[in-house]
């Protein structure tokens, strides 16, 4: 199933609407608004992200990352001025006041590209940000997680459930999302 990116908030969905893929994401994904947090077997907190009446999207949508990537790649292929280059690896970045120069490695050799802008959208451990000496803004959690995608027949509601120290997995935490 694949749980890399899986949960997209309303604001992300609004941005995906601008790219023309919001409808595909919402129709394929699982929409949800309610989240519940438990300590052992007792619910200690809950929230409802129910959208305001004039909002077009739900609070959250769960969708496997590979579907979102598929929709974005298909949409990019339809847009003029966008060129996707597969199996190309940026190996160095030089930033100047007016431009940025990339050195790119391919199976056929190296080449350089100069651009006005560079967007480092290459993941949490971004080699591009590292080459530029940029830190990730925000919090980094060093905790280790086991993610398991399980196909099962169960009548769980489309909600986010999170347990601290659950009776079925003591001294740990568990997150349950419907996909």
What would you call each of these model-derived segments?
Residues 43, 74, 117, 121-179:
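Conserved FAD-binding catalytic core of PHBH/FMO-like flavoproteins
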Residues 38, 103-107, 151:
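A generic structural motif
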Residues 26, 83-85, 137:
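General small-molecule cofactor/ligand-binding pocket signal
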Residues 108-117:
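Core beta-strand elements of the Rossmann-like FAD/NAD(P) dinucleotide-binding domain
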Residues 2-77, 87, 94, 164, ...:
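Active-site-adjacent segment of FAD-dependent monooxygenases/related oxidoreductases
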Residues 87-91, 106-107:
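Conserved SAM/SAH-binding loop
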Residues 94-101:
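A short, glycine/Asx- and small/polar-enriched loop/turn
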């Amino acid at each position: 199933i694949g749980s890399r990116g899986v949960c997209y908030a309303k604001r992300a969905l609004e941005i995906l609407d601008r790219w023309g893929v919001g409808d595909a994401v919402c129709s394929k994904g699982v929409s949800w608004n309610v989240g519940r947090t438990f300590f052992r077997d007792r619910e200690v907190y809950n929230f409802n992200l129910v959208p305001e009446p004039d909002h077009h999207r739900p609070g959250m949508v769960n969708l496997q990352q590979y579907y979102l990537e598929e929709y974005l790649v298909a949409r990019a292929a339809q847009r003029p001025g966008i060129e996707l280059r597969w199996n190309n690896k940026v190996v160095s970045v030089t930033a100047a006041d007016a431009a940025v120069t990339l050195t790119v490695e391919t199976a056929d050799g190296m080449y350089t590209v100069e651009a006005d802008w560079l967007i480092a959208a290459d993941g949490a451990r971004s080699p591009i940000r590292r080459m530029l000496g940029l830190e990730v803004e925000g919090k980094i959690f060093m905790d280790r997680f086991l993610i398991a995608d399980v196909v099962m027949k169960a009548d769980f509601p489309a909600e986010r459930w999170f347990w601290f120290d659950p009776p079925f997995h003591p001294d740990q935490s568990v997150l349950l999302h419907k996909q």
